[in-house]
Amino acid sequence: DNLRDAVAKLGEISENEKSGFISLVSRYLSGEAEQIEWSKIQTPTDEVVVPYDTLAPPPEDLDAMKALLDKLVVLKLNGGLGTTMGCTGPKSVIEVRNGFTFLDLIVIQIESLNKKYGCSVPLLLMNSFNTHDDTQKIVEKYSNSNIEIHTFNQSQYPRIVTEDFLPLPSKGQTGKDGWYPPGHGDVFPSLNNSGKLDTLLSQGKEYVFVANSDNLGAIVDIMEVTPKTLADVKGGTLISYEGRVQLLEIAQVPDEHVNEFKSIEKFKIFNTNNLWVNLKAIKRLVDAEALKMEIIPNPKEVDGVKVLQLETAAGAAIRFFEKAIGINVPRSRFLPVKATSDLLLVQSDLYTLVDGYVIRNPARVKPSNPSIELGPEFKKVANFLARFKSIPSIVELDSLKVSGDVSFGSGVVLKGNVTIAAKAGVKLEIPDGAVLENKDINGPEDL
């Protein structure tokens, strides 16, 4: 009740946000964030996770395709900042390739789709209070494009002080640090609260494709799930549980089963967070307040104060939709850029850029991408760019490990397994045009 009273007095947020927050906290306190009963988990069958190649092909007829696409809306989750990569502002404005940002590529893709089929697929961006102002300025540059861009904000919830369970903003924390965006599970109520859902339904739109703005593989094609590789061991997976399909995230796994959860044998698929959802169903479920997704408690510290933020994931909503299925899609549908090592992949000759689509180079024989580990010297985008005169050729690379003060000249070719480790205090420069194949380099003498 103290929390309820304190929240009621917060002037910065709407009544919808207040009631949404209070109901999330009530669910959390009633023990709904409980972990799952491990023995009840079953691997989903092909009926609920459908193999991609068994899907019916889209109609050949252009008019039929146009009619389908005219019912579609693309929604990108744009609430994240580029802080982990050393950038201020929205992550979607990091330059990915040829000077284009994530957002540029998304706009170019939808433009070419609209042009090709004569359709009008709009783009929605769900911002957070962290990215809203910057995004509003950035989208102005697309005002001449053939694409309608709508933005709306996801909810802004107060962080809870762990000690006395009161909102941080009512304890004198006036800045942004007092608040948090409650995860992308919030996309459904926020789409409704913003009025955008009703607008889209009134325009005859029927489906929304939801994806992370940093997943370059999330182009308009068809919830998708892809074969798990070792890089994805922490990602959520789809399971059958008490007769329904649901998303299982690592936060819900009992400690003694975490290693089993990470195993590629038992859980072969993971959630790409590419979701295809019926807009009318969203409206019906949001109005009925039926979307009670699993709560993920995320403990943080703000200026030495321990706080709690309660979050939900969009994919977890799958169990509230009747007849929901997963689709096991090719790896190409999941090309996320979470770190500069991913940036190295997408800026290299492993990919080309066509109509805003990042497409894999057919010259790459192996189906999987090389594994890349870069040391902390490469963590920030600016430092990463400064250490490469040009991005090396990695079409024949299996793995690369770089540590220490290393920089690369132009036209470098890396093949097989390459490890480069500069000793402390030593600056190691890989010369222009160097070809390194299955090499261990610890100093200039090894080049």
Residue spans for each PLM region:
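Left-handed beta-helix
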Residues: 1-70, 220-447
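Short His-Asn-centered micro-motif
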Residues: 96, 125-129, 154, 211-213, ...
